């Protein structure tokens, strides 16, 4: 059976270059189903505006290289500590370490004073940040730590607290989504270790928690050890490259956080979830991981088997694109968000945006607009029913059509 419209991802690029049709041992209806799915993805991807993903993946050359060498014929696995040589030699630890080194420098970690790995997602990074933080605090105190996080931070933190059986204290947020420091002060137990998750861009409103004020409050009111993890899933991607002082928010030597988690598929543009987790060497040394004899190592990650392909993609991306190209994308996103905010206000749409944010949230439009742009809904107790538009590199061409649709909606209401 011959198919021409759909190719499995791992073979499409190299075979298309050769213009060779593939024989695929599959029932015709199965092939047609796959074809329809592929067509839907490629038609819809550039219309996604309500979720923080960069659809400009730009991985054609990577997959051409990957398929040219038939790497899909072998099984690679990055199990273990990437800083130690693994008995399972089919890994990409050397590339993973170079990715970590690149981002450790980007986030201001002192040379030689960090440890990290390429994660499966931003939540995977948060899971490790909280786990490493818990072990760090247990090495300093016999008392169980309390996990503090804003109510408007990513929902995964609540789930992770449950999985790790941690006492969770949800801190109120102000109208724009930033952690309310007065409430943090009221809920802070001065005598028990504190594990604080700082939101570097809340899920819906794109708010940034005030790290300096959090540290000051800890100095004034807290006597036990503390650990600060930075959830910078989206903002940690673009802030280090953007003009202005936003980079200071994700600089470890300035902000003194203990670990950071960043997503790869959000700003950088990958075709599947991945991310990066980095912590200080002191935190890593306090982990005391379980030793696995047949791996001849102590495995520090919660996950055992890990993707070896994701580190390759990350390595490829940071070598194929210059810092100036990332800077261009970052600045364009922030300028696009400012422009969108201004244009929505000009057509009488109530809209808001936080500093350093590429997220604009606004009064919720009708269902047809929500569905057309894959907008995320929220029922906010202060603003009512709202939606948000996340300006990403691929949404530049969407801004004007979206504003026109919103204008048409407002005009229909008036008439």
Range-by-range predicted roles:
Residues 241-354:
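Active-site C-terminal subdomain of aminotransferase-like
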Residues 117-288:
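Conserved PLP-enzyme active-site core in the AAT-like
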Residues 1-25:
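Classical Sec-dependent N-terminal signal peptides that target proteins to the secretory pathway
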Residues 97-104, 108, 131-134, 162, ...:
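Amphipathic, well-packed alpha-helical segments that form the structural scaffold of globular domains
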């Amino acid at each position: 059976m011959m198919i021409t419209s759909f190719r499995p991802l791992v073979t499409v690029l190299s075979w298309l270059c050769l213009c060779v049709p593939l024989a695929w041992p599959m029932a015709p209806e199965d092939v047609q189903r796959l074809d329809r799915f592929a067509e839907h993805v490629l038609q819809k991807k550039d219309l996604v505006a309500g979720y923080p993903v960069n659809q400009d993946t730009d991985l054609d050359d990577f997959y051409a290289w990957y398929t040219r060498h038939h790497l899909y014929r072998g099984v690679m696995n990055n199990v273990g500590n990437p800083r130690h040589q693994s008995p399972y030699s089919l890994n990409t630890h050397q590339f993973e370490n170079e990715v970590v080194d690149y981002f450790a420098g980007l986030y201001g970690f002192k040379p030689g004073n960090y440890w990290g790995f390429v994660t499966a997602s931003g939540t995977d990074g948060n899971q490790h940040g909280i786990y490493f933080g818990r072990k760090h605090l247990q090495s300093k105190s016999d008392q169980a730590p309390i996990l503090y996080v804003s109510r408007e931070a990513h929902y995964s933190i609540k789930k992770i607290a449950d999985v790790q059986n941690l006492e969770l204290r949800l801190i109120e947020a102000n109208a724009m989504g930033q952690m309310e420091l007065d409430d943090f002060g009221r809920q802070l137990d001065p005598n028990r270790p504190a594990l604080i998750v700082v939101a570097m861009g809340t899920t819906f409103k794109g708010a940034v928690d005030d790290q300096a004020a959090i540290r000051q409050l800890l100095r004034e009111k807290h006597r036990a050890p503390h650990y600060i993890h930075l959830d910078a899933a989206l903002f940690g991607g673009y802030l280090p490259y953007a003009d202005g002082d936003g980079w200071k928010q994700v600089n470890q030597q300035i902000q003194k956080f203990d670990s950071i988690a960043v997503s790869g598929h959000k700003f950088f543009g990958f075709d599947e979830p991945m991310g990066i987790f980095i912590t200080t060497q002191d935190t890593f040394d306090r982990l005391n991981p379980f030793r696995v004899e047949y791996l001849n190592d102590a495995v520090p990650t919660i996950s055992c088997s890990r993707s070896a392909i994701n580190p390759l993609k990350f390595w490829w991306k940071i070598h194929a694109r210059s810092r100036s190209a990332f800077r261009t994308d970052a600045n364009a996103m922030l300028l696009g968000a400012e422009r969108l905010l201004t244009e929505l206000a000009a057509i009488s749409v109530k809209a808001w945006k936080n500093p350093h944010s590429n997220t604009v949230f606004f009064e919720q439009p009708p269902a047809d607009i929500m569905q057309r742009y894959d907008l995320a809904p929220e029922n906010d107790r202060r603003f009512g029913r709202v939606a948000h538009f996340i300006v990403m590199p691929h949404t530049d061409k969407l801004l004007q059509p979206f504003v026109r649709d919103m204008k048409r909606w407002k005009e229909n209401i008036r008439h």
